[in-house]
Design a protein with these regions (language model features):
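A glycine/proline-hinged amphipathic helix-loop "lid/cap" segment
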Residues: 1-60, 224-233, 237-238, 324
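Short beta-strand-to-loop junctions in surface cap/lid or active-site-entrance loops
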Residues: 53-65, 248-252
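Short beta-strand element of the alpha/beta-hydrolase
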Residues: 65-74
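A fold-wide structural signal in alpha/beta-hydrolase
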Residues: 68, 97-101
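Active-site glycine-rich loops that stabilize anionic/oxyanionic intermediates
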Residues: 73-79, 267
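Catalytic nucleophile-loop/oxyanion-hole region of alpha/beta-hydrolase
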Residues: 81-82, 88, 101-136, 304-310
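Gly/Ala-rich beta-loop-alpha elbow adjacent to hydrolase catalytic centers
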Residues: 141, 145, 149
Length: 324
């Protein structure tokens, strides 16, 4: 690996070597690489319940008012599985005394937007039927998972219209949204325009690249895959982007949009879109906080047994405690 001109935490450098190229233009190769890297069976400490919609870790001695933490996996919207995060989610269930739900959302391009967002909502609705509607909810996502977390919360709060606007659906969304206490967005992937400074500065990564992002966004929105040259800029209609990731508006506070914790990496093409989201929420009157740890890069925030992951868990723990 060539030496980076940017500071990277030494403890995280092995991640770059171990991570296969994110070939969103060649999904069979990308998915196979992810399977080889991440598909290591985890022996759960807590009780694990698996349904078609997701995987739930339930800690022993579960409190009646224990929260539900929805933990949405990343993968550029086109790869990954809920089981890949079993070790992390099992750990979070123990640490927070929470039911940790990882939705098994369907992947693009086979299932483009809004299907993955609706799958996450359906997984949460199913969990509430099983575990009760009296529990506070927190929503956590990493990278594309953070994008789905934000899009999911916006949909539940009525900031974008669901495909089916029947009264029963709207009433269910209103009930669920009233229970959400906070949303945690780690290195969020929410801006398909590829127009930020960091998108250009870190076009070659490490790990997540501008070309990978262009392919992922084409797949997510069900559009033709751009050529490498075309992928340098976005041709996704603005109205389509807004339907998935609406920019913060002044009325967000009025609808009770939940507090947000946003974490970005200094060396990441997605850095500036996360910063823009956090400041946009603040400018809209919402409660939001923004963190950036020196030397992190895309995909490095939850590396097991790292100081970085300890810092992130502490942030999440404090945020959940304050907003419970």
């Amino acid at each position: 690996m060539a030496e980076s001109p940017f500071f990277l935490r030494p403890e995280l450098l092995p991640v770059i070597e171990a991570t296969p190229e994110q070939t969103t233009w060649n999904l069979p190769a990308m998915r196979a690489g992810g399977d080889a890297l991440l598909e290591n069976p985890h022996e759960a400490i807590n009780r694990l319940e698996v349904t078609a919609r997701g995987r739930s870790f339930i800690p022993d001695g579960l409190r009646d008012n224990a929260p539900i933490l929805v933990s949405i996996h990343g993968g550029g919207y086109v790869a990954g599985r809920a089981a890949f995060d079993d070790a992390k989610n099992d750990e979070l269930a123990t640490r927070f005394g929470a039911i940790v739900l990882s939705p098994e959302y369907r992947l693009a391009p086979e299932f483009p937007f809004p299907i993955p967002v609706d799958d996450c909502i359906s997984a949460l609705a199913e969990a509430l039927e099983r575990f009760g509607y009296e529990r506070p909810i927190f929503v956590l996502g990493d990278s594309a998972g953070a994008g789905l977390a934000y899009s999911m919360v916006c949909r539940l709060y009525g900031l974008v219209s669901p495909v089916l606007q029947d009264e029963e659906t709207m009433a269910r969304y209103e009930q669920i949204s009233s229970m959400i206490r906070g949303v945690v967005l780690l290195e969020p992937c929410i801006d398909p325009t590829l127009s930020t400074h960091s998108s250009s500065l870190f076009a070659d990564g490490p790990i997540w690249t501008r070309r990978a992002a262009a392919g992922a966004w084409s797949h997510f929105f069900g559009l033709a895959l751009a050529t490498e040259e075309e992928g340098k800029k976005s041709a996704i209609p603005e109205a389509l982007v807004e339907s998935a990731f609406p920019k913060p508006r002044e009325h967000l506070r009025a609808v009770g949009f939940p507090p947000a914790l946003v974490v970005v990496n200094p060396v990441d093409p997605l850095r500036d879109e996360g910063i823009a989201l956090a400041t946009g929420l603040v400018d809209s009157g919402c409660i939001a906080e923004l963190h950036m740890f020196a030397g992190t890069f895309h995909g490095s925030l939850s590396v097991p047994d790292s100081v970085t992951w300890d810092e992130i868990r502490s942030l999440i723990s404090r945020f959940m405690t304050e907003n419970y």
